[in-house]
Amino acid sequence: CATLHVAAAHGGDAILFLMPADHIIRDLEAFGAAAARAAELASQGKLVTLGIEPQHAETAYGYIEADGESVLRFVEKPSKEKAQEYLASGRFYWNGGMLVYRADTMLKLLEQHCADILQASRASLAVASPLDGAGGEGVVFDASTFARIPALSIDYALLEKTDGIAVVPSNIGWSDVGSWNSIAELTDADEAGNRVQGDAVLIGS
């Protein structure tokens, strides 16, 4: 729906950056460089993802196998043994769920691989209302028509069926904040191993 709205408002050559809202990126300079490279590739008509350079053999993330800036395949969350193989190979990146693309590129791929999703999205956007205070950049979708859009992840609906996807290897201080271990990595521990943000009184801890 967002891609349709942006294409209508800004044209098919508009570049969109699709990313999760609940992840953390700590190295903004590196992120800016990666985003600029991704936008450059996207402007050439490529569907682009950011591949997070793995810091350890993680089993909680999907992986991207790559040859340079070309995606070879997306793989599901691996076993510990497979994750160690991926890390040692130097060809695999964590899949952080970020995509960069031209609006017309995405619409063409949706038409090709999942036309039902595109059709339902168009129907929902057609009856959407302008979002107050957004200057025409935002809309509020009608709940009933939006609910008719098939609920299928973009990985299954599109990425696994699309050839020629590009990847930008990225070391950007990324975390999905998806586990206690990942939360612990975001803050320094005191001498007793406690990690605290804000005012706190620790007693016997």
Where are the regions a protein language model picked out?
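Conserved beta-loop-beta/alpha segment of the NTase-like Rossmann-fold superfamily
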Residues: 1-68, 100-101, 108-113
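A residue-level structural signature of the nucleotidyltransferase/glycosyltransferase Rossmann-like core
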Residues: 16, 72, 91, 98-99, ...
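Structured helix-beta-strand junction loops
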Residues: 44-45, 89, 161-164
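Glycine- and other small-residue-rich loops at beta-strand/loop junctions that grip anionic moieties
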Residues: 50-53, 72-75, 98, 147
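Nucleotide-activated chemistry modules centered on ATP-dependent adenylation/adenylyltransferase
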Residues: 58-60, 77, 127
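A short, charged helix-loop
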Residues: 66-93
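A conserved mid-domain beta-alpha-beta active-site/ligand-binding segment of alpha/beta enzyme cores
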Residues: 87, 92-101, 110
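Left-handed beta-helix
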Residues: 101-205
